[in-house]
């Protein structure tokens, strides 16, 4: 089975390290990022230096339209997804909970809760034998 992974929040930290590990394990890799294109392309260069086929794709995982576009891009460039690492997340930096706006709270929930569910939904639509897939793995 071909190994294709999407790593959300793949431009730094745990996501970047996961991309490097996936490269060593022979995966074709999509490094998803939300805002730091420069960091994502830095990870992309490192992954490619290890011999992996890889792309960097900007998408806001809290938007189903953007998640759909992300998965379609990966389908076209790398093939059917066989693994998903839901790593993207956001926190309330320098905010006290009693000072957080409803907008900020909803943004955190959309990214950290809705995002992984949307990504898992679209991964399962590709991985599940019910939908023509051959199985796969999702890491949350």
Question: Predicted segments — roles?
Answer:
Residues 50-53, 73-84, 93:
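A glycine-rich helix->loop->beta "capping" turn
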Residues 120-121:
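A short, exposed helix-loop element centered on a Lys and neighboring polar residues
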Residues 25-42:
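Conserved glycine-rich Rossmann-like NAD(P)H-binding loop of the short-chain dehydrogenase/reductase
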């Amino acid at each position: 089975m071909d190994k294709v992974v999407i790593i959300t929040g793949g431009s730094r930290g745990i996501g970047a390290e996961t991309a490097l590990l996936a490269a060593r394990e022979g995966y074709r890799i999509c490094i998803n990022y939300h805002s730091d294109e420069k960091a994502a392309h830095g990870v992309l260069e490192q992954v490619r230096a290890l011999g992996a086929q890889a792309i960097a794709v900007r998408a806001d995982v809290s938007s189903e339209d953007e998640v759909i576009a992300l998965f379609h891009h990966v389908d076209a460039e790398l093939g059917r997804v066989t693994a998903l690492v839901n790593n993207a997340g956001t926190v309330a930096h320098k905010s006290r909970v009693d000072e957080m706006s409803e907008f900020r709270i909803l943004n955190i929930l959309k990214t950290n809760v809705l995002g992984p569910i949307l990504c898992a939904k679209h991964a399962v639509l590709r991985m599940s034998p019910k939908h023509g897939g051959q199985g796969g793995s999702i890491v949350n």
